[in-house]
């Protein structure tokens, strides 16, 4: 596993939870994840859950994605999706406001791998270099992804070659994120 990415993700998650504690005097709250089982859930309200990050359980890899395409996935992507279970977190990188995607449970991890495979299928069909998404943006046609060839983090427009490099590595990207509440 890519230790730098794992440490950077854990550090950002701590910054996010600390900012939430400071502003709301509680763990993060999510309405979107209400009713979805997870080891992260601390307590529930009538329409939301309070969550706390938990260590990832299971095989710490995205081998299902590798097997589907007979490719080697950047070790940083393995680390990103298998360091922890947590809720999605809102963040800012430079001028970009984003939702950092996380796996909520073992079931969610399987779903994420299926979505990554679907993303790669589309890219292969369009003859685009392979990327693996890690965050969404307000514009649904754009995502933040890791280029599987270079390891760079890019803002990309789905289905096109439009990509802007944001950081040389996933660890560098995560280190520069600022929590948004």
Curated annotation (Swiss-Prot):
The keyword Cell inner membrane applies. It is found in: Cell inner membrane. The keyword ATP-binding does not apply. This is Protein Syd. It holds the Pfam family Syd. It comes from the Bacteria. Interacts with the SecY protein in vivo. May bind preferentially to an uncomplexed state of SecY, thus functioning either as a chelating agent for excess SecY in the cell or as a regulatory factor that negatively controls the translocase function.
């Amino acid at each position: 596993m890519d230790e730098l990415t794992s440490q950077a993700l854990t550090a950002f998650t701590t910054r996010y939870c600390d900012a939430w504690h400071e502003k709301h005097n509680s763990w993060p709250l999510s309405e979107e994840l209400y009713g979805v089982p997870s080891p992260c859930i601390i307590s529930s309200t009538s329409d939301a859950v309070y969550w706390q990050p938990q260590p990832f359980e299971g095989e710490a890899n995205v081998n299902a994605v590798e097997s589907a395409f007979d490719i080697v996935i950047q070790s940083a992507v393995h680390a990103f999706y298998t360091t922890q279970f947590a809720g999605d977190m809102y963040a800012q990188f430079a001028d970009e406001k984003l939702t950092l995607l996380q796996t909520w449970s073992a079931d969610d991890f399987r779903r994420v791998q299926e979505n990554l495979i679907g993303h790669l299928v589309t890219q292969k069909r369009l003859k685009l270099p392979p990327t693996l998404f890690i965050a969404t943006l307000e514009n649904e046609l754009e995502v933040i992804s890791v280029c599987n060839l270079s390891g760079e983090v890019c803002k990309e427009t789905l289905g096109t070659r439009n990509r802007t490099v944001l950081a040389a590595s996933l660890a560098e990207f995560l280190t520069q994120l600022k929590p948004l509440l």
